A protein has these predicted regions:
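Long, C-terminal-biased catalytic regions of enzyme "large/alpha" subunits
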Residues: 1-174
Length: 174
């Protein structure tokens, strides 16, 4: 599935991370989907499950279909993608630990599988911080990935975050 964030924003006018209305509604939606799967399973003797997957190319297609059907709705269909499964929207300011804690409750309601991601800066010189995030993942969430910015130049051997400066189209590295 995809678009829980946008669903809640459309139905409640808030993000699914908003604790008073957003999160409870999002959890109810997820429980409803799980209950529907159980009902279909009983009726058909075929197993159904909710799969919280990253759907990068599909979220673009879904967004285009929603835009065509419903038009542009601010905060819902105004981008060329919808948010993966239960994920916190990329524009929301949230630290890695809070993001993992928030998303863990939705992984429990995604029995077909789920993955969360946290983006962190280049941490190759801060291994204790990496281990701290990894331990938090191990202790608090079913499945998560830690994405860090680290680049390697095959020409000069530089290992770290490479930034490109657009200086008159030079593509100069700094």
């Amino acid at each position: 599935y995809a678009g829980l964030c946008e669903c809640v924003r459309y139905m409640k006018g808030v993000s699914h991370t908003e604790p008073k209305e957003g999160t409870p509604f999002a959890l109810k939606v997820m429980q409803y989907l799980n209950d529907a799967c159980e009902q279909w399973k009983k009726e058909s003797n075929i197993d159904f499950s909710i799969y919280g997957t990253p759907l990068e190319s599909t979220t673009y297609k879904f967004a285009k279909c929603l835009q065509k059907r419903f038009g542009i709705i601010e905060g819902v269909t105004d981008k060329n993608y919808i948010t993966n499964s239960y994920h916190v929207h990329v524009t929301e300011q949230i630290n890695a630990f809070d993001k993992l804690k928030f998303e863990s409750q939705f992984q429990k309601l995604s029995p077909g599988g789920a993955i969360s991601y946290v983006e962190v800066p280049n941490m190759q010189d801060n291994i204790p911080a990496v281990l701290s995030v990894m331990q938090y993942i191990y202790d608090n969430i079913m499945y998560a990935e830690l994405n860090t910015q680290s680049d390697y130049c095959q020409v000069c051997g530089y290992d770290g975050e490479i930034k490109i400066v657009e200086e008159e189209g030079s593509g100069k590295l700094i």
